[in-house]
């Protein structure tokens, strides 16, 4: 797992913005940049739909890969929920990054079935007393897929290739980051994709990416519960 992919295993921790300070840890500058840009993308869609002055806070928690995320899931959930640091814990990981040693998703044909199986597995390792305040979501197949919803932001010579398939239909044999690297010749998350997150309209990606929609609408639902 490279340092630029570590952010994929962050979990959104809802907290009352006025009561709790930011829990963002000191992390490497590239990882911090990625987390900040992703949060801005989320808040650009979430905040306008909440009452004035009632924004919720979302704090990313860093993990070193999906295996580390799974190993620490139970402990981290207990840590943040037991002492009131968070109201809810929301997990977001790359679907294609889940180790087959944990759950072999190749036995499931559709993306929907893979997600159902992966979510069921992750919920099974969460103690029952926390499950009502835990949500697990997936980037299909990577966060970069969301940015494929904006072909106009990429060089003209590659736009036709980007629009040939729906963003979340980029398959596991060539996930979005590899696809972008192939068609662009060079691709670096922190200097290419992350520069797009703050300036694009999240609704465009939400309309084109059903599993991103599930994630964002779940965040909105939880945020409204805190009002």
What residue ranges belong to the model's regions?
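Long alpha-helical, hydrophobic tracts
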Residues: 22-25, 29-32, 36
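C-terminal accessory helical subdomains adjacent to catalytic cores in phosphodiester-
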Residues: 2-17, 23, 37-63, 67, ...
């Amino acid at each position: 797992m490279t340092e630029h992919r570590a952010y994929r295993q962050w979990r959104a921790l809802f907290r009352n913005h006025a009561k709790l300070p930011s829990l963002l840890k000191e992390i490497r500058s590239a990882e911090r940049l990625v987390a900040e840009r992703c949060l801005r993308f989320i808040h650009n869609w979430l905040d306008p739909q909440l009452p004035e002055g009632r924004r919720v806070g979302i704090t990313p928690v860093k993990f070193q890969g999906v295996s580390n995320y799974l190993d620490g899931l139970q402990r981290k959930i207990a840590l943040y929920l037991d002492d009131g640091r968070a109201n809810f814990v929301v997990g977001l990981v790359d679907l294609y990054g889940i180790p087959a040693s944990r759950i072999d998703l190749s036995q499931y044909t559709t993306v929907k079935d893979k997600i159902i199986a992966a979510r069921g597995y992750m919920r099974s390792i969460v103690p029952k007393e926390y499950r009502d305040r835990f949500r697990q979501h997936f980037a299909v197949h990577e966060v970069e897929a969301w940015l494929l919803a904006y072909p106009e932001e990429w060089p003209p010579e590659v736009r036709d290739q980007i629009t040939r398939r729906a963003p979340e239909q980029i398959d596991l044999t060539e996930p979005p980051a590899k696809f972008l690297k192939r068609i662009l010749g060079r691709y670096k998350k922190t200097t290419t994709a992350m520069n797009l997150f703050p300036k694009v309209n999240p609704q465009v990606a939400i309309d084109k990416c059903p599993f991103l929609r599930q994630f964002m609408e779940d965040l909105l639902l939880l945020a409204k519960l805190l009002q």
